Swiss-Prot record:
UniProt domain MsrB: residue ranges: 2-125
Keywords associated with the record: Oxidoreductase
InterPro entries assigned to the protein according to its UniProt record, in alphabetical order: Met_Sox_Rdtase_MsrB, Met_Sox_Rdtase_MsrB_dom, Mss4-like_sf
Any one Gene Ontology cellular component term annotated for this protein: cytoplasm
Entry keyword Signal: no
Record protein name field: Peptide methionine sulfoxide reductase MsrB
A Pfam family assignment: SelR
UniProt key word NADP: no
EC number(s) stated in the UniProt entry for this protein: 1.8.4.12
Family under the similarity heading: Belongs to the MsrB Met sulfoxide reductase family.
Domain of life: Bacteria
Length: 142
């Protein structure tokens, strides 16, 4: 399983995950990335989302219709910047991931997990076994 010490984070990774920051839209690694695989928490390495639930939302950040395992996600009320939103954090590392909104695809449950690329790491399907995520291969065989 991939893990990263907080001291190894880049400036933007630290600002996003530890200071509840947000990276710029359309200028981040995964906003337009649709390869087959799994997205894991940048710090703990815990699997959070798969490419099967990723969709193009035109918001400029990676968007997913659901989490791989709801137990790996914490949702908190966020009243920052004069808005009322639902913050999404990683359960294992308590890192800020992004926000969840109720404007996602209706046929997939209506949610849009809007996630910062700086908070996640993509594991290609072909490398799942090699990197310790082999148990997730069956998720793609449905």
């Amino acid at each position: 399983m991939l893990k990263k010490d907080k001291s190894e984070l880049t400036d933007i990774e630290y600002i996003v995950t530890q200071e509840n920051g947000t990276e710029p839209p359309f200028m981040n690694e995964y906003w337009n990335h649709f390869d087959k695989g799994v997205y894991v928490d940048k710090i703990s390495g815990k699997p959070l989302f798969t490419s099967e639930e990723k969709f193009h939302s035109e918001c400029g950040w990676p968007s997913f219709s659901k989490a791989l395992d709801d137990d790996e996600i914490i949702e908190l009320v966020d009243k920052s910047f004069g808005m009322l939103r639902t913050e999404v954090r990683s359960e294992e590392s308590n890192s800020h991931l992004g926000h969840v909104f109720n404007d996602g695809p209706k046929e997939s449950g209506g949610l849009r997990y809007c996630i910062n690329s700086a908070a996640i790491q993509f594991i290609p399907y072909e490398k799942l076994e090699e990197l310790g995520y082999g148990d997730l291969i069956s998720h793609f065989d449905k």
